[in-house]
Structure formats: C-alpha cells, structure tokens
Amino acid sequence: MSLNKTIYEGKAKAIIETEDLSIVIQHFKDDVTAFNKEKYEIIDGKGIINNHISAFIMEKLEKAEISTHFIKTLNEREQLVKKLKIIPLEVVVRNVAAGSFCKRFNIKEGERLASPIIDFFYKNDDLADPMVSENHILYFDWLSSKEMDEVKTTTLKINEILVHLFSNASIYLVDLKLEFGRLINDSTKIVLADEISPDNCRLWDKNTYKKLDKDVFRLNLGDLKEAYLEVAKRLSVKLG
C-alpha cells in the first residue's frame, strides 16, 4: 500500500503517499519541540503513545458523527488517513486560562472561562503562527463565512465531547488545538485533520492540577513519556 515516499514532514509527524491518491499514511515521530523549535528532543516511544491516543479519540469522534480524516490504525506508529488540503489555521478552543492566553491578557493561570473561547492562528512557522481574526480569514479566503461557522460549530462540539471524555478519566481539558482540511476529491467537504493527543491538548489532573501534556516538556516539569502514558492509562487506551 505504501510507496515509501514522504510527501510532507512536520515537527511530530510525516505523511507518506500510498497507491490510492485519496489516502495517505500518517506516521507519528518521537520528536518533541517547543517554542517554535527552539527546544527539541527525541523521546523514545512518544509517537507510539500519541498514535494510539489519537486513534482512540478520532474513533470516538466519528461515532459522535464528527467527520475526520482517520480511517484506521496500521501499526504502532502509523494510521491510514484521508488525504487533505490542509487549511492553514490552528483552531484553539479554551476552557481554562493557560499558556499564551494568560500572557496576552495578564490573567492568572487556572481561571475557568464562563464559556469556551475559540482563537484562530495562521499556521506559519516563519511568522511564529500569528493570531488572526475572522476578518483576516475571510480576506485571505482560507474559509468562507459559511465554512467558518461550520468550523466553529464543529470545534465546540468536539470540545464538548472531549471535555466529557477526559472528565471521566479525572482530567481537565484545559485547551485544545485543532486543524481542519478539505478532502482532495471533494473540496467542499471540510473534516478534522492532524491528531488529538497530549501534544496538542492541555490536560490537568482534576485533583492535583498536575500537567499531563507537552507543558511537562516546555516547562521542565518531569518525565513527558510518563505523563503521556498516564493519559493513555486513564482513557483505557491499549498501546499494543
């Protein structure tokens, strides 16, 4: 199935083409980065954990009628996914104040938000992923007004599902970064892309507020792999 040709390689994943032009393989790497690649390390097995957690969550979302690129897990590091034209936006939904949100508004980390807040960022490493408004998105034609409403509605639905999922595992979903893309064979169809794992969620233990996400690496708080394994264990994700 695989032609072994990598058509895209990012910080944490690689995309490999297959004989079917509408399907690709998503390969999870052990690389971990922070601060726009200023901090970098390889953590053995990190990609395996994220592959399984993301597959578990994508399957949950599909059952909840959220359209995703996920097709199936191939092996410990790879998934078969639909090929997409990625929309150059990071869609961040926040439930609790943390990270850049606190710095931007000078508020204390951990403050609960009355309702989820959605922020958009332009995916561009050279520009350090600047925050953009809905007017910017319309101006650059990344999404139409109707598509933007669709993405926001889907984002809030995903957030609601995952807040409940993680809460049942005694974890707070603090915030979540999503990406979307258009199907190669139907550009009118926008689906959830990328991954959902501790790499792109902020996750805190509900009792101790211990961080169980990439902030462990960013802020030198301990063993990243141990934190990710704890998330997998609490979600009852089987790693092999």
Swiss-Prot record:
The keyword Flavoprotein does not apply. Its EC number is 6.3.2.6. Gene3D superfamilies: ATP-grasp fold, B domain (3.30.470.20), Phosphorylase Kinase, domain 1 (3.30.200.20). It holds the Pfam family SAICAR_synt. It catalyses: 5-amino-1-(5-phospho-D-ribosyl)imidazole-4-carboxylate + L-aspartate + ATP = (2S)-2-[5-amino-1-(5-phospho-beta-D-ribosyl)imidazole-4-carboxamido]succinate + ADP + phosphate + 2 H(+). GO terms for molecular function: ATP binding; phosphoribosylaminoimidazolesuccinocarboxamide synthase activity. Transmembrane segments: none annotated. GO terms for cellular component: cytosol. It comes from the Bacteria. It is an enzyme of class 6 (ligase). Pathway: Purine metabolism; IMP biosynthesis via de novo pathway; 5-amino-1-(5-phospho-D-ribosyl)imidazole-4-carboxamide from 5-amino-1-(5-phospho-D-ribosyl)imidazole-4-carboxylate: step 1/2. Keywords: ATP-binding, Ligase, Nucleotide-binding, Purine biosynthesis. Belongs to the SAICAR synthetase family. PANTHER family: MULTIFUNCTIONAL PROTEIN ADE2 (PTHR43599), SI:DKEY-6E2.2 (PTHR43599:SF3). This is Phosphoribosylaminoimidazole-succinocarboxamide synthase. It comes from Wolbachia pipientis wMel.
